[in-house]
C-alpha cells in the first residue's frame, strides 16, 4: 500500500476533516476549514499538548495573549527589521519565488548535496548557485530572474478609522512575543521561581510566498509554544530536557521512530543569539517536514524588550542573592502541522481478504475525533442504544449510527479513526451486555452495560 497525500487529502475532504476555505465562492488560495471531525482531532491534539506541557507539568503555566500588539513589540523582537524571505521574480511569467526554496527543490530533484543550510547563504551565494546551475523557473521553465530581495512576512493592518502610520498594527507572526512581554506579570501573579515556563496556544499569521502541501504551510496557522525561563548556566541542560520531552510526547501519541528524526542545526545555521537549535521532523508522503523547533534563545528576547520598553525584565534569585536576565528555551510546535502528521501517520489500508481492503485511521485514543461509535444492530433497538450513547457522551465524544448494514457502519468508523464501537443487539435486551469492537484488532468482547464507563476509562488513559 502506497501512502500518498492524494489519498489522505481525499479522505480528509470526504469525511469532514478539512474543507477548502470559502469553497462556494471558488475558494481562497491556501486557506482550509476544519470540518466536524477535523476540529475534534485538532482540539484533541491541543488538549494533549496542554495536558502534558501545562496542566500536568509543575514548572509551567499558561496564558492567552492578544493577536494585535503594540508595534514596538515587533521592533524589539526584530520582526519589523529582519523577518523576511529572499524573493525573486521570473521576468518571463512574472511569478514570484523564494530563492532558497528553488535551490532546495532543484537539489532534491537532481539528488545533489548542498553545503549547509540554504537559509544561512547570502543573497550573492544563492544567486551564484542559481546562475551556475542554470536553474529554470518552476512555472514557465525559462531562466530569467530578477535580483534577490527581502520581503517582510508580517501582515499589516490599521487600528481605528484612520489608515496612517500612527495606527499601523500587525497580525502577530508568532505567539512567543506575548509571553515575553508578560514575563513579569506572570512571574509576579503565579509566584513562580526560576526555572519555570509559560505556554500558549493561539493563531499566528505569516504572508508566506510559497505556502502549500495541504495544511502543512499556510498563511494563517496555530501554534503551541512554550517559553521556559532558566538560569544562564543551566540552559543547555534544559534544552536537552525539553527536546527529549517533545520526542516522548510525539511517540506516546503514535508517531513511530522511523517516521521522525531530529536535525541539530549546524553552527552557521544558528541565529546569532542562539546557542543551540534542533528541529524535530516528520516523514510526510511529500518528504521530511519540520514539526517542532526547539531553540536555546539565551537572554536575547527579554534583553531586547527591556532595552526598547525601558522596563526592568530581570529576575532576582533570592536564594542566590543574584539578579540576572533569564535564558529561554523555546519548544515551538505547529498545531496544524502536527495534526496533519498524526493524520498521515494514522492512515492505513489493510487487506482483510483477497480483494477486500479496509481504510483505517489508527489514531491514538486520546486524539481520535470520535472515541466511541454506538451502533444498534437494528433500528428496533435504537431507543435503548441511545440511552448508552447519552450516558457515555457525558464523558467522550461519541457518534450514534443506526443506518445501514452493520459491516458498512464498522468500516465507516474505521475510516474516521474511532477506536471502539459498541454494538447493541437483540441479546442486549436480555443479558444487559453489549459487544465492544476494537478498531485496530477488530476483536470483539462482551461487556456489561453497567461496566462500560470503567472499561473505557482505562482505554482512554493518557
Curated annotation (Swiss-Prot):
<dbReference type="InterPro" id="IPR027031">
    <property type="entry name" value="Gly-tRNA_synthase/POLG2"/>
</dbReference>
<dbReference type="Pfam" id="PF00587">
    <property type="entry name" value="tRNA-synt_2b"/>
</dbReference>
<dbReference type="InterPro" id="IPR036621">
    <property type="entry name" value="Anticodon-bd_dom_sf"/>
</dbReference>
<comment type="similarity">
    <text>Belongs to the class-II aminoacyl-tRNA synthetase family.</text>
</comment>
<keyword id="KW-0963">Cytoplasm</keyword>
<dbReference type="InterPro" id="IPR033731">
    <property type="entry name" value="GlyRS-like_core"/>
</dbReference>
<feature type="binding site">
    <location>
        <position position="174"/>
    </location>
    <ligand>
        <name>substrate</name>
    </ligand>
</feature>
<keyword id="KW-0547">Nucleotide-binding</keyword>
<comment type="subunit">
    <text>Homodimer.</text>
</comment>
<comment type="function">
    <text>Catalyzes the attachment of glycine to tRNA(Gly).</text>
</comment>
<feature type="binding site">
    <location>
        <begin position="330"/>
        <end position="334"/>
    </location>
    <ligand>
        <name>substrate</name>
    </ligand>
</feature>
<feature type="binding site">
    <location>
        <begin position="334"/>
        <end position="337"/>
    </location>
    <ligand>
        <name>ATP</name>
    </ligand>
</feature>
<keyword id="KW-0436">Ligase</keyword>
<dbReference type="Pfam" id="PF03129">
    <property type="entry name" value="HGTP_anticodon"/>
</dbReference>
<feature type="binding site">
    <location>
        <position position="98"/>
    </location>
    <ligand>
        <name>substrate</name>
    </ligand>
</feature>
<dbReference type="InterPro" id="IPR006195">
    <property type="entry name" value="aa-tRNA-synth_II"/>
</dbReference>
<dbReference type="GO" id="GO:0004820">
    <property type="term" value="F:glycine-tRNA ligase activity"/>
</dbReference>
<keyword id="KW-0067">ATP-binding</keyword>
<keyword id="KW-0030">Aminoacyl-tRNA synthetase</keyword>
<dbReference type="GO" id="GO:0005524">
    <property type="term" value="F:ATP binding"/>
</dbReference>
<feature type="binding site">
    <location>
        <begin position="290"/>
        <end position="291"/>
    </location>
    <ligand>
        <name>ATP</name>
    </ligand>
</feature>
<dbReference type="InterPro" id="IPR002315">
    <property type="entry name" value="tRNA-synt_gly"/>
</dbReference>
<feature type="binding site">
    <location>
        <begin position="206"/>
        <end position="208"/>
    </location>
    <ligand>
        <name>ATP</name>
    </ligand>
</feature>
<dbReference type="InterPro" id="IPR022961">
    <property type="entry name" value="Gly_tRNA_ligase_bac"/>
</dbReference>
<dbReference type="InterPro" id="IPR004154">
    <property type="entry name" value="Anticodon-bd"/>
</dbReference>
<keyword id="KW-0648">Protein biosynthesis</keyword>
<dbReference type="GO" id="GO:0005737">
    <property type="term" value="C:cytoplasm"/>
</dbReference>
<dbReference type="GO" id="GO:0046983">
    <property type="term" value="F:protein dimerization activity"/>
</dbReference>
<dbReference type="InterPro" id="IPR002314">
    <property type="entry name" value="aa-tRNA-synt_IIb"/>
</dbReference>
<dbReference type="GO" id="GO:0016740">
    <property type="term" value="F:transferase activity"/>
</dbReference>
<feature type="binding site">
    <location>
        <begin position="216"/>
        <end position="221"/>
    </location>
    <ligand>
        <name>ATP</name>
    </ligand>
</feature>
<protein>
    <recommendedName>
        <fullName>Glycine--tRNA ligase</fullName>
        <ecNumber>6.1.1.14</ecNumber>
    </recommendedName>
</protein>
<dbReference type="GO" id="GO:0006426">
    <property type="term" value="P:glycyl-tRNA aminoacylation"/>
</dbReference>
<dbReference type="InterPro" id="IPR045864">
    <property type="entry name" value="aa-tRNA-synth_II/BPL/LPL"/>
</dbReference>
<dbReference type="GO" id="GO:0140096">
    <property type="term" value="F:catalytic activity, acting on a protein"/>
</dbReference>
<feature type="binding site">
    <location>
        <begin position="221"/>
        <end position="225"/>
    </location>
    <ligand>
        <name>substrate</name>
    </ligand>
</feature>
Amino acid at each position: 500500500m502506497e501512502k500518498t497525500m492524494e489519498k489522505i487529502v481525499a479522505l480528509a475532504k470526504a469525511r469532514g476533516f478539512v474543507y477548502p476555505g470559502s469553497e462556494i465562492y471558488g475558494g481562497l488560495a491556501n486557506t482550509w476549514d476544519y470540518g466536524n471531525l477535523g476540529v475534534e482531532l485538532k482540539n484533541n491534539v491541543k488538549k494533549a499538548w496542554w495536558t502534558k506541557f501545562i496542566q500536568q507539568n509543575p514548572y509551567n503555566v499558561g496564558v492567552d495573549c492578544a493577536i494585535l500588539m503594540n508595534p514596538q513589540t515587533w521592533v524589539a523582537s526584530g520582526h519589523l527589521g529582519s523577518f523576511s524571505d529572499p524573493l525573486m521574480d521570473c521576468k518571463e511569467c512574472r511569478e514570484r519565488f523564494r530563492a532558497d526554496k528553488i535551490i532546495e527543490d532543484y537539489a532534491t530533484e537532481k539528488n545533489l548535496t548542498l553545503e549547509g543550510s540554504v537559509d544561512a547563504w547570502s543573497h550573492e551565494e544563492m544567486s551564484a548557485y542559481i546562475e551556475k546551475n542554470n536553474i529554470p523557473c518552476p512555472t514557465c521553465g525559462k531562466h530569467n530572474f530578477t535580483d534577490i530581495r527581502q520581503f517582510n512576512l508580517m501582515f499589516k493592518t490599521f487600528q481605528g478609522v484612520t489608515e496612517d502610520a500612527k495606527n499601523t498594527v500587525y497580525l502577530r507572526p508568532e505567539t512567543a512575543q506575548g509571553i515575553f512581554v508578560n514575563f513579569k506579570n506572570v512571574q509576579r501573579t503565579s509566584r513562580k521561581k526560576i526555572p519555570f515556563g509559560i505556554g500558549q496556544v493561539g493563531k499566528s499569521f505569516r504572508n508566506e510566498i510559497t505556502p502549500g502541501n495541504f495544511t502543512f504551510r499556510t498563511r494563517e496557522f496555530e501554534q503551541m509554544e512554550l517559553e521556559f525561563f532558566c538560569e544562564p548556566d543551566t540552559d543547555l541542560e534544559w534544552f536537552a530536557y525539553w527536546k527529549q520531552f517533545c520526542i516522548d510526547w510525539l511517540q506516546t501519541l503514535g508517531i513511530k521512530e522511523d517516521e521522525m528524526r531530529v536535525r541539530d542545526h549546524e553552527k552557521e545555521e544558528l541565529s546569532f543569539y542562539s546557542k543551540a537549535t534542533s528541529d524535530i521532523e516528520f516523514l510526510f508522503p511529500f518528504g521530511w517536514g519540520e514539526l517542532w523547533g526547539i531553540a536555546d534563545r539565551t537572554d536575547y528576547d527579554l534583553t531586547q524588550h527591556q532595552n526598547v520598553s525601558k522596563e526592568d525584565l530581570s529576575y532576582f534569585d533570592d536564594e542566590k542573592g543574584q539578579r540576572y536576565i533569564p535564558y529561554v528555551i523555546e519548544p515551538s510546535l505547529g498545531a496544524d502541522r502536527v495534526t496533519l502528521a498524526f493524520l498521515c501517520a494514522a492512515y492505513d489500508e489493510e487487506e482483510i481478504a483477497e480483494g477486500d481492503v479496509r481504510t483505517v485511521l489508527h489514531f491514538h485514543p486520546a486524539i481520535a475525533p470520535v472515541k466511541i461509535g454506538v451502533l444498534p444492530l437494528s433500528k428496533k433497538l435504537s431507543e435503548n442504544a441511545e440511552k448508552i450513547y447519552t450516558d457515555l457522551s457525558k464523558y467522550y465524544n461519541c457518534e450514534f449510527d443506526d443506518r445501514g448494514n452493520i459491516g458498512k457502519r464498522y468500516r465507516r468508523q474505521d475510516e474516521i479513526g474511532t477506536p471502539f464501537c459498541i454494538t447493541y443487539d437483540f441479546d442486549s435486551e436480555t443479558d444487559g451486555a453489549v459487544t465492544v469492537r476494537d478498531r485496530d484488532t477488530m476483536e470483539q468482547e462482551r461487556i456489561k452495560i453497567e461496566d462500560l464507563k470503567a472499561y473505557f476509562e482505562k482505554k482512554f488513559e493518557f
